[in-house]
Swiss-Prot record:
UniProt cofactor note: Binds 1 Ca(2+) ion per subunit.
Record note on quaternary structure: Homodimer.
Matching SUPFAM superfamilies: (Trans)glycosidases, Glycosyl hydrolase domain
GO BP field: carbohydrate metabolic process
Keywords of this entry: Calcium, Glycosidase, Hydrolase, Metal-binding
Cofactor: Ca(2+)
Domain of life: Bacteria
Protein name: Neopullulanase
Active-site residues (renumbered): D328, E357
Protein role: Hydrolyzes pullulan efficiently but only a small amount of starch. Endohydrolysis of 1,4-alpha-glucosidic linkages in pullulan to form panose. Also cleaves (1-6)-alpha-glucosidic linkages to form maltotriose.
SMART domains, sorted: Aamy (SM00642)
TM stretches of this protein: none
Length: 588
């Protein structure tokens, strides 16, 4: 056994409370090194005749990445506390792995050998809103979705879709335009809208906030926003707003006061200022987002700033009943601020969704005291590299997805915000080189994966564009310019996701990933319900054997409704280039 690859720690993604009664435990071992693992566990105070009393249970291998295998066990400690270790088997070799190291036999004279989960406290639970697990999100960049009220469009706005956008161009998109097209979203199957910032700002993107308590007048007013949210709720759609608390805009009144009054300004400590007077060249002498002078960084450790921003967060929940906050540049704000943020917004609306924009490993923010989820860019990276760019093989892709899933606890994965693209990335059809078949595979995997999927406006009809600002083109409303086949594909997948709980909440298992032909087989399982997904990510027809003994069941093609009895031990399906199929497995 390769001892140096064996790893566990009683915290985070390796040991966590799944609910108020259940503990999840994981173990990492070298890939293909261990035959089986047993969990050794017991109450730390359960002793008889000088020996600690423990039980043994098998652990289940839940997946592998490029280097490691991952093992899993679920325990319900009767007294909500646990001491535990692992017994590993490889051929004739046996090792006991504990917090103090490795042993050949199980130590029973002292529980101090073992890993400890001291007590399962409900207050320590990671609990994301349950509704998020069933939500299909739709991200809207308000300035480019629809112009419902031309009378409030900014001066110099261009005719809708008349030209490609620039960083400073306006086309007049607004909140009324979103209201006017809610039926389109309902028909698609959308149950959550994520709006990029809507607060007063001089830019088209609104990430340089001037007033956090006012709707930008070119988007509408508070009454229009209230109407939008009420209409959404009537139609079963949740609404999430975007908060920019890392930095403000140049026109934010406190920053203007500092710019005018310098060191004598009462707001000077609201920002991270290195010296006075303020200057922007060659670089700002105050902290900013990136090095953008128009986006000064807020000092969230300052009690006045903290109170101001927390009041902003609670105001829009209390007065407008929003359902979530997406938090921009969340990783550059101190953890203490986010802990207080969570306490205040959850006290007001316990099932509000808190989503952080973090592009890297975000475990420090996902321990139950800060965020409910982060934007799952590691997922995005993997699916684009496999389906769109064809940079990695099927096995490498399966490994990467398993690494993503094992980086976080299961209850974190269930609420993860899974996106294919956004206002910060190139359009997926552009990344796919214009190949709609690849885009279909992207949506198929996204809408059958664990977590909460988000569609960037227009991707479902085949809009194109490179990085910002090209990815922020006006929504195409002319039916003749929309890809109806792609739209129908997305609509059908969303409907299937709603119909089959396993597609929303089931555990994913990769059954086979073929590097030679680049096909992928995985299943989603929830209780007795199983859906099998088979994908051919190659430009050649593939005859694919199904590594699943399904004898005694019906295989129902969810795309066509056809069904056939699985009577043979080995089944096979034939798929065209970039083809796919979904089977529900139903018992006779």
């Amino acid at each position: 056994m390769r001892k140096e690859a064996i790893y566990h720690r009683p915290a985070d993604n390796f040991a966590y409370a799944y609910d108020s009664e259940t503990l999840h435990l994981r173990l990492r071992t070298k890939k293909d090194d261990i035959d089986r693992v047993e969990l050794l566990h017991g109450d730390p105070y359960d002793w008889q005749n000088g020996a600690w009393q423990f039980q043994m249970m098998p652990m289940r291998k839940t997946g592998s990445d490029e280097l490691f295998d991952y093992w899993f066990a679920e325990v319900k400690p009767p007294y909500r506390r646990l001491r535990y270790g692992f017994v590993l088997y490889s051929g004739e070799e046996k090792l006991v792995y504990t917090e103090k190291g490795f042993y050949f036999e199980v130590p029973t004279d002292d529980t101090a050998y073992y890993f400890c989960f001291p007590f399962l406290h409900r207050v320590d639970l990671f609990e994301a809103p349950d509704w998020v697990k069933d939500t299909v999100w739709y991200q809207i960049f308000p300035e480019r979705f629809a112009n419902g009220n031309p009378s409030i469009s900014p001066e110099g706005s261009r005719p809708w879709g008349s030209e490609d956008p620039t960083p400073t161009s306006f086309f007049g998109g607004d909140l009324q335009g979103i209201i006017d097209h809610l039926d389109y979203l309902v028909d698609l199957g959308i149950t959550g809208i994520y709006l990029t910032p809507i607060f007063r700002s001089p830019s088209n993107h609104k990430y340089d906030t001037a007033d956090y308590f006012e709707v930008d007048p070119h988007f509408g007013d508070k009454e229009t926003l209230k109407t939008l949210i009420d209409r959404c709720h009537e139609k079963g759609i949740r609404v999430m707003l975007d908060a920019v608390f890392n930095h403000c805009g140049y026109e934010f009144a406190p920053f203007q006061d500092v710019w005018k009054n310098g060191e004598s300004s009462k707001y000077k400590d609201w920002f991270h200022i290195h010296e006075f007077p303020l200057q922007t060249e060659p670089r700002p002498n105050y902290d900013t987002f990136r090095f953008v002078p128009q986006m000064p960084k807020l000092n969230t450790a300052n009690p006045e700033v903290k109170r101001y921003l927390l009041d902003v967060a609670t105001y829009w929940i209390r007065e407008f009943d929003i359902d979530g906050w997406r938090l921009d540049v969340a990783n550059e704000i101190d953890h203490e601020f986010w802990r207080e943020f969570r306490q205040e917004v959850k006290a007001l609306k316990p099932d509000v969704y808190i989503l952080g924009e973090i592009w890297h490993d975000a475990m420090p923010w996902l321990r139950g005291d800060q965020f409910d989820a982060v934007m799952n860019y590691p997922f995005t990276d993997g699916v684009l590299r496999f389906f769109a760019k064809e940079e990695i093989s099927a096995r490498q892709f399966a490994n990467q997805m398993m690494h993503v899933l094992h980086s976080y606890p299961n209850n974190v994965n269930e609420a993860a915000f899974n996106l294919l693209g956004s206002h910060d990335t190139s359009r997926i059809l552009t990344v796919c080189g214009g190949d709609i078949r690849k885009v279909k595979l992207l949506f198929l995997f996204q809408l059958t994966f664990t977590g909460s999927p988000c569609i960037y406006y227009g991707d479902e009809i085949g809009m194109t564009g490179g990085n910002d600002p090209e990815c922020r083109k006006c929504m195409v409303w002319d039916p003749m310019q929309q890809n109806k086949e792609l739209h129908q594909h997305v609509k059908q997948l969303i409907a299937l996701r709603k119909q089959y709980r396993s597609l929303r909440r089931g555990e994913i298992s990769f059954l086979h990933a073929d590097d030679e032909m680049n096909y992928l087989i995985y299943k989603k399982t929830d209780g007795d319900e199983t859906v099998l997904v088979i994908i051919n990510r190659s430009d050649q027809k593939a005859d694919i054997p199904i590594p699943l003994d399904a004898r005694g069941t019906w295989l129902v093609n969810l795309l066509t409704g056809e069904r056939f009895a699985a009577e043979a031990e080995t089944l096979c399906t034939s798929l065209p280039p970039y083809g796919f199929v979904l089977y529900a497995i139903e018992h006779w």
